[in-house]
Structure formats: C-alpha cells, structure tokens
Amino acid sequence: MDNTSANSCTKAPQTAVQNRRKLLYGQKMAYIERAVDTRLERLLSSMGGVLIEGPRACGKTSTGLQHAKSSIRLDESPTVVQLAELDPQAVLQGDTPRLIDEWQLAPFLWNIIRHEIDDRQARGQFILSGSAAPTDDIRRHSGAGRFARLRMRPMTLTESRPSTAQVSLSSISASEQLTGVHSDLTYKDLAAEAVRGGWPALTNESIGDAMDFNASYCADLTSTDLQVSTGIRHDPVRMRRLMESLARNTATEATSGSLASDVAADGSGIDRNTIRIYLDSLSVVFALEEQPAWAVSLRSRTRLRKAAKIHF
C-alpha cells in the first residue's frame, strides 16, 4: 500500500468513512494512462491470457477494460458466480480479449480457461484481474505457457501527474545524459502526495478526502477483506497496529522480530509467528510486497544484502 502514512491506518469517523466510500468508489472518471499499458499490450500479443494482480482500487479493472473488447465482473452479484458454476462457458463467451474481473471469486475457472486457451490456439484471449491471490490448490495448473502475470501497483507520481517524467529508469539504463532537470515540487507537495497515495480515485480529491479514503481502506482490510480472502480470522486491533508499524517501516529491512517489538511498544504483545501469519495474509491481498535483496554481478566480491525490503 505505497505512499500511505501511518496515520491513515487510524479509524476514521464511521459517517465520514461511509460518505467517502460512496463518493470515491461510485464515481466515474476518465481513464488515466498507466505504466503497465504498453506491457499489457505486448503480453496480449504473445500469450493466450494475462493475469493482472494488485491491491484493491489500484486500477486493475479500468486498465483491463481499456484493453478488453468484452467483460464480465464476478463481484457484481452472487448470481454471476452461480452462473459461472452452472455454465462456465457462458462466462467465457464474448469478443476477445475478454476481461474476467475478480476471477478469484470463482477459482475453478482457472483450469477451464487454461483448457479454453489450448483449444482456441490463439493469443490475447483473456484478461483476468483480481485483488486477492486465490488459496493454493494442488489441482490448479500453474498456467505456464498460457498466462503471463502482470503486477499492478498504486500510481507513480508520473502517472498521477505531479512528476514531469524528465527522468526515467529506461533513460538511465540507456545511459542518456540528463541535464537541466528541475522539479517545481516542494517538500510540502511531496508530503501531500505521500499522504494522498497512488489511488486513481483520489487524483482530484482533497488531502482530507484522501485521508478518509485511506482510513476506510485500512478499516476494510482489517474487518472484511483479509478474512474473506484468506479464511483466517485476524485480531483487528493487532492487525491495525501491525499495519501502522509497517507504514513506519516501509522500504526497510524490517524483520518479523523487529515488527513484533514495534507492535509490542504500542501496548499489544504479539509473537513472531503470528506476525508472519499476518504478513502472509497482507501479501495475499497485495497490501504488502517484499522487494528481494539486490544482487550484483556473480563475479563481484561486493557483499550482498540478504534481507528483503518490505513495502506497504
């Protein structure tokens, strides 16, 4: 959950949360071009299907719809999932690429879609998007050779427009010379963007509205999303305190032990094993991501960092 502050995980007044949720989840807005658009097009031209994964509200559905020619949303109604169970082929029929949104609500579709791709022998057939990884199922094929995985995250400053995009990783990799690069953003502006977060729905909202949204998002995670996605009942108070600790320690090599100590300092004792279970649950809904330690050339004698950095 990039760019959110520890304060965003505190509980907002219930009426404010409800009003903000209606405003931000219900509004329609013009599509914002995303960094993954080009890669999604390339993957659709080379694979039978693409699986878009990422946290709720990061823009997966909008991006999928932008590239799809037909779609079905499994979270619209319980009857849609029932239809998928009774007649899976009805869900798969439509112009291609066909978007199947929140597919993890009907995980049995995975093997059916995989076989459909094999039968059609065509590329760019399906786009699957989901805000939670389905539980492990030994019967489910990996999808290798049929599906490409595409990870989406909240928007970068370039996507949300505050950045001038004068510097990019591709230009640095190409050894392009960078001269006269200047940004009008102040430290205050950057702090405001960090509080706002990279959610597409918040692009034109005030900082106050953004804080309400982020508080609501965290509250939904602790009260509903995690249990629905993992089947595990978590202590909402401990989970919220862990999330606050993760926000404080984001982009660091924090360990389960250090996080447990940090949470304990807030007055809630919790052991390392429980912390690990909670971290795994947050990873399932893509609210937490571990960045592997950077590895230099194998021939280099430079000492490698071994611990992953956590991003929340």
Region spans (language model):
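Hydrophobic anchor at the beta1->P-loop junction of P-loop NTPases
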Residues: I52
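Conserved nucleotide-sensing/catalytic segment adjacent to the nucleotide-binding pocket
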Residues: A84-I127
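N-terminal pre-Walker A segment at the start of P-loop NTPase domains
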Residues: S5-S8, A12-E41
